């Protein structure tokens, strides 16, 4: 009887330890990815400010502080406006980097699920080795995200950041799409 109770206590302690490891890994993923996307949002806010307020530092400050960084101006809205600008003013860049920039919507969806989803600490998740991933209940029905998959998401976010750096350099110029000879 005592050994059964002792076994139950040990199993419970193992589950608690497994849950701690899962939550630690989830915090690590969330922290890294949400920070990356926050930097992307900051860069887009600066690009939009520079685009719409080119010559007046006072207007730039007002636009940045009171419009583009406010909660009503969501990251999704910023992204949509940026995509329209790139398509309209930098069509050659858009053609070359359309795939990368189009992945932005996937990044936002992943970011939102990561930020707002509960961590899966079901018995199945607690029994799974941590190297097989961490599940978030609202992301693909709790399917675990492995380190490799997470790294792929980070690469996508870094590619978006690189594109934003390019777009910042393009801002003073407007591309003219070359007509193809027929």
Residue spans for each PLM region:
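Short, well-ordered coil↔helix boundary/capping segments
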Residues: 94, 98-108, 147
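Active-site oxyanion-binding pockets that recognize sulfate/phosphate
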Residues: 23-30, 94-97, 150
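Short secondary-structure subsegments characteristic of cysteine-rich extracellular domains
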Residues: 127-144
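Amphipathic alpha-helical interface elements
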Residues: 2-84, 102-109, 113-124, 156-180
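Generic signal for short, ordered secondary-structure residues
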Residues: 12, 19, 26, 89-90, ...
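Intrinsic disorder/low-complexity segments enriched in polar/small residues
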Residues: 79-80, 132-133, 148, 155
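Short, solvent-exposed, charged loop/turn and helix-capping segments
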Residues: 82-97
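Short, flexible active-site recognition loops that position polar ligands and cofactors
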Residues: 140-157
